[in-house]
């Protein structure tokens, strides 16, 4: 894992340099608010597209064609991200109460009776062999988890990744466990000077498989490799995004037609994959046209092998 750690530190330094420009910070914050809401919710089955997520967050625009809760999830996630950003800037203590605050925001207006409260019933993860703790054990497990969170450690990157795993494994809530765990992860990363990890919907199966391997076989290697790779890819996405705002924006990112040519597939195929949610632009021009990174060619190759 040392090689990927080195790449992460290199890209972290590049991003930090770009973020010295206040305009770049504003661009990134706005993009992350939508991107994290879209990806984290999509992993849990939310049906909104990226554009619909953005419209719900920025304009509060909804459509009767999709469940109202899908829109509320987008808005709530954006609020939760703003909460963890503010908390990270103030170095707010990350403990049990902090996690409950995140969860309360996530389920606000959707399930107020359970928002910010631990589950009182048994739950299971559909399709998983993981056995989740008895609800009677949850309060004590969360207190132990909170005490561990408050311990200072040298490697806060690995601690943040481990914290995500531990919270998902305790599964303290009736709903919203994954979203809350990913927000906790990213809160810890932000406080430690890293960027958030974006887990793409296309990687959902690998993500859940790596988690289950850790939970059922006590083999953490696939999970840590997956999360570190996701962080490095996320950093590169953010760097590419900010490159759009340089003097030569088209130098690093490609229009849909140029990206289709690079991948040797018809433009219509790229558009179809976008519609199906299998492929997403990494950024958008001021006119709303999608832009792709050359590295996304690997995503296309993966889709073609499905």
Residue ranges and their predicted role:
Residues 1-175, 179-306:
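FIC/Doc superfamily catalytic core
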């Amino acid at each position: 894992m040392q090689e990927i750690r080195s790449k992460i530190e290199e890209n972290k330094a590049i991003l930090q340099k770009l973020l010295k420009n206040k305009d770049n910070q504003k661009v990134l914050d706005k993009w992350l608010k939508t991107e994290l809401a879209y990806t984290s919710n999509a992993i849990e089955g939310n049906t909104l597209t990226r554009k619909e997520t953005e419209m719900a967050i920025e304009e509060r625009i909804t459509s009767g064609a999709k469940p109202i809760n899908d829109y509320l999830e987008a808005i709530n996630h954006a609020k939760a991200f703003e909460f963890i950003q503010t908390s990270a800037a103030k170095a707010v203590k990350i403990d049990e109460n902090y996690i409950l605050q995140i969860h309360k925001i996530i389920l606000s207006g959707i399930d107020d009776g359970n928002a910010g409260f631990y589950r009182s019933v048994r739950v299971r993860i559909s399709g998983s062999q993981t056995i989740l703790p008895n609800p009677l054990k949850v309060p004590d497990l969360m207190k132990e988890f909170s005490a561990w969170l408050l311990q200072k450690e040298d490697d806060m990157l690995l601690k943040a990744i481990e914290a995500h795993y531990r919270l998902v494994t305790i599964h303290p809530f009736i709903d919203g466990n994954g979203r809350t765990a990913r927000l906790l992860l990213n809160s810890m990363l932000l406080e430690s000077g890293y960027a958030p990890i974006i887990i793409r919907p296309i990687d959902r199966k690998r993500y859940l498989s790596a988690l289950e391997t850790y939970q059922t076989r006590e083999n953490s290697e696939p999970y840590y490799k997956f999360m570190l790779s996701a962080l490095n890819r996320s950093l590169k996405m953010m760097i590419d995004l900010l490159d759009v705002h340089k003097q030569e924006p088209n130098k690093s990112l490609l229009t849909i037609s140029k990206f289709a040519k690079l991948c040797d597939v018809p433009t219509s195929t790229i558009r179809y994959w976008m519609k199906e949610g299998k492929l997403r632009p990494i950024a958008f021009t001021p006119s709303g046209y999608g832009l792709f990174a050359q590295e996304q060619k690997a995503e296309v190759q993966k889709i073609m092998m499905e």
